[in-house]
């Protein structure tokens, strides 16, 4: 594993917040491993005869049950590996397209270890350009990046279609996505994998495309979280290669640097 990232998606309202997230590990081969997913806050009322309302979280800073305090705990929690050593989340990305001022206050305090992400041209049809970057730095803030949403979702969908047979003793293809065995109520279809089926690609007559939800009832938040976890890793790699003055750098270049080869 080369590094671990986190992607987060803001939902709800300032005083009734839910922040969804996914933690993903990225291997030298290009395969990824989902480590955990979850939500800070919920829109589901507590069950029971008394109908007690759920505990509500807030996007306000410095208040009780602020999502930002809880997110700090999640990001700073060490992650055990199979070899016995601990890893930390290297970088995180938060969707700032909604309730941006709350998110900006948070990312501005993190010195680029956590950056903001915004979808770009989400409603426009896009050409599938293989060499196009998935992001560009925003003119608004140095720690905010504009994500080529349709292009990035297209690439994520391609990775979702990859197949691998573990009985053939061959490496996993680059981009292959690994998921834990469902346990503890996580990684089930209803609360996780259904999010990956919530959107579809729409083609127009010129063979350009865009991605959008199949209908207003479906939930796509964890699909977005996985997308953000991938993009923020690409951003970090690009920043490191730029600082080292490596032009047209690749994932292999980055791995060689961090693995001291």
Short names for language-model regions:
Residues 1-115, 153-261:
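RNase H-like, metal-dependent nuclease domains and their acidic two-metal-ion catalytic environment used
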Residues 108-158:
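Conserved beta-strand -> loop -> alpha-helix junction used to position metal-binding or nucleic-acid-contacting
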